[in-house]
Amino acid sequence: KGNQNSSDTTSRDTNATSHTYNLGHDFLLNNLISTNTALGYGDSDANDDTGDYENYDFSLRFNFAFPWAYISIGDSLSFIDYKKVDTSIDSGRLRSDFTNTIDLTITKALGDFFPSLDPNRSLFLNLYFERAISESNIRNYDYEADSFSFSVNRSFQIFK
């Protein structure tokens, strides 16, 4: 639950309870290439019924464990059907969205660049790019968005 401020009704009304179910399959082709596929279903119920929706998802991902870097390329398709008409936008049309999200992740050990800083190659640098294209039957909800991120991860073993 998000904002519980009684004076901000927009935030309170868009709070939602969601349940999602996914079925996935991972396939290791060889030591270099693996794939992931997934099917998903979700149901979200907001305090304000105009935010209630069901979504159906399909995703496909290819992973490449090259000796010089780990690269992962994915594509996800989401079909979102809203349950109630949002009268603030269009009083006669039930909203339905289609979103295609493509992403690319590149991971490289810091020790490959600076062996003295990370001799065990357990500190990883990650670059991530995502492009989302969403089309709706109500034009106000169409959008395209790009996202970039950079992160640093450290792996360690808790129990030996």
Predicted regions and their residues:
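Gram-negative and organellar
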Residues: 1-160
